[in-house]
Amino acid sequence: MDLSRINTRKSKQLKSFLSSKDTFKADVHGHSALYYAIADNNMRLVCTLLNAGALKNLLENEFPLH
């Protein structure tokens, strides 16, 4: 699955994606939906993912803290 175009999905597609069990899994590039939402400055999607529990499911080393 390639999540790099998650910001172009329509709201109905996004709701379907958020209800799936693959929501917080990494894509073929090793990044999560939260990574792409932050990279594209899509604050609405970032907030939606955070409310859905993205912080509990962060991928190790995806967001290095330094």
From Swiss-Prot:
Coiled coil: none annotated. ANK repeats lie at residues 29-58. It comes from the Viruses. Keywords: ANK repeat, Early protein. InterPro entries: Ankyrin_rpt, Ankyrin_rpt-contain_sf. Induction: Expressed in the early phase of the viral replicative cycle. Belongs to the orthopoxvirus OPG039 family. This protein is homologous to the N-terminus of poxviridae interferon antagonist K1L. Presumably a premature stop codon mutated the gene in variola. This is Truncated interferon antagonist OPG039. It comes from Variola virus (isolate Human/India/Ind3/1967).
